[in-house]
Design a protein with these regions (language model features):
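Short, surface-exposed loop or secondary-structure junction motifs
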Residues: 144-404
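Structured C-terminal helix/loop/strand segments within mature extracytoplasmic catalytic/sensor domains
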Residues: 408-460
Length: 460
């Protein structure tokens, strides 16, 4: 631990060693990496931390999720790191510390934002730059004057999401509507809590192929490849989408899809390659990747939804989010896979104001700007989510979280929160969308926020 920076070392010689060292010579090193410690070392109560397990067991019993990872670190010391449950409800494969989860929108703050901060550090843009300065297709649209900071604060007015997949469906392959608010013969498949869909449609053969071939290299799922020209459809759909009120809070995945495009243009490389080369590989985050099947065994990856609508298969190693899938799995809004141990290294980097393991990855000034800024009209930070003052159902955090906390949640059942006041990290990763996204018990039971409050009670 000492050699790799997991613990600090302080020591002096009380006597001289002839020809080598004089009395008083010593070694003094700082703790630069996360390491495992007993809760008592940070004055946390082990008994109160045990409450976490009871909250998780409640969620497992009520089938809010089949399994999860929970991670807590304080003062750079890991005081809680446990895996619970299974990959799915068949209970054949138990979750362990190496299990990898689809982070969903937590990717925005753990992946895309990391790349955005690096580009900002390198002076590739300013917060007041117009996004159309980097994406010229938007120059002759009503999106031309949107500032980069508007996208980061989610106050651009852009629509929450766009169903890009509709452009790949053959409209002549079915009759009637694709969606229904009630289950019937034409709409037998439940899509979410309020929507049923048909599954008798076909994809346009000039856009979707069952095998990889020239022109069809964008992988959506197993045996599904999208024509490479579809990226032009995506930017056109964004350009033509309805724009709401600028300056008013409206959470939008489109904001981060555009930020990813900006980063790739300014940094002159794909975002996944940038993040791997500049951050994940150096941090030792070997289980963190977009399109994880390129580097990890399928058996390490926790499945998300059994998709009976678009991809018609169990999604395992392929991103759950449809908008990200139709961009080949690397998107600004979703696509990153990781486990709690890997993710903690990124979060500790944020908490350390840009450094980890003795290396400075981002400037302190950039880290302070992005982690401390807050939008005037709402709770959002610069790319990060934050608590609502006073807590309550409107807040993504527990009632005991201070205002300084920043982090994000993910649709698949994930969250992470960084607390600079208490030098604290909290990570919860689950696959609550397995086997269906219609299950929202994770939210209704307040599992993530109850765990967060239990952590604060344990460290007080």
């Amino acid at each position: 631990k000492a050699i790799f920076g997991g613990i600090a070392v302080k020591g002096k010689l009380s006597v001289s060693i002839p020809t080598l060292y004089t009395a008083g010579t010593g070694v003094f090193t700082e703790k630069t990496r996360l390491g495992y410690h007993e809760p008592e070392e940070v004055e946390a109560s082990p008994e109160r931390l045990d409450v976490i397990a009871s909250i998780v067991e409640d969620g497992l019993e009520q089938k809010a999720f089949p399994g999860c990872q929970v991670f807590v670190a304080k003062d750079g010391m890991i005081i809680y790191d446990k895996s619970f449950g299974y990959f799915d409800y068949d209970k054949k494969q138990a979750v362990d510390e190496n299990s990898v989860y689809d982070l969903a929108s937590s990717s925005k703050a753990a992946g895309t934002l990391l790349a955005v901060m690096k580009a900002y550090d390198d002076k590739k843009f300013t917060l007041n730059n117009k996004i159309s300065d980097f994406i010229p297709e938007l120059k002759d649209s009503d999106k031309k004057n949107l500032a980069v900071k508007d996208l980061l604060y989610h106050q651009s007015g852009l629509t929450p999401t766009i169903n890009f997949y509709l452009n790949a469906i053959d409209k002549d392959s079915y009759k009637g509507s694709l969606y229904s608010n009630a289950k019937n013969q034409a709409h037998p498949v439940r899509f979410d809590a309020r929507t049923y869909v048909r599954n008798d449609f076909s994809f346009l053969p000039n856009l979707v192929s069952a095998r990889k071939k020239p022109g069809f290299t964008t992988e959506i799922a197993r045996n599904m490849y999208l024509h490479d020209s579809f990226k032009d459809t995506i930017i056109r759909e964004i350009k033509d989408s309805r724009l709401g009120v600028r300056g008013k809070y409206k959470y939008s995945c489109i904001n981060f899809i555009l930020l990813k495009m900006m980063v790739e243009k300014q940094m002159r490389q794909p975002m996944d390659r940038l993040l791997h080369g500049m951050f994940f590989s150096k941090l030792g985050a070997w289980h963190t990747a977009y399109n994880p099947l390129h580097i990890l065994d399928t058996m390490q990856i926790v499945p998300t939804e059994n998709d009976h609508f678009i991809r018609r298969q169990l999604l395992r190693g392929y991103v759950h989010d449809e908008a990200a899938a139709f961009q080949g799995g690397v998107s600004g809004n979703a696509g990153l896979f990781s486990n709690a141990n890997d993710l903690a290294k990124v979060l500790q980097l944020y908490l350390n104001q840009g450094s980890y393991g003795g290396e400075q990855y981002l400037s302190k000034e950039t880290c302070r700007l992005f982690t401390q800024s807050k939008s005037p009209p709402c709770r959002r930070g610069l790319g990060f989510d934050k608590p609502v003052a006073g807590g309550g159902k409107a807040s993504p955090c527990g009632s005991l979280a201070p205002a300084s906390v920043y982090g994000h949640t993910g649709f698949t059942g994930t969250c992470f929160w960084v607390d600079p006041d208490n030098n604290l990290l909290y990570i919860f990763l689950s696959n609550r969308v397995n086997p269906t996204r219609a299950n929202n018990k994770l939210g209704s039971l307040d599992i993530r926020t109850r765990i967060q409050d239990a952590i604060y009670k344990a460290i007080k």
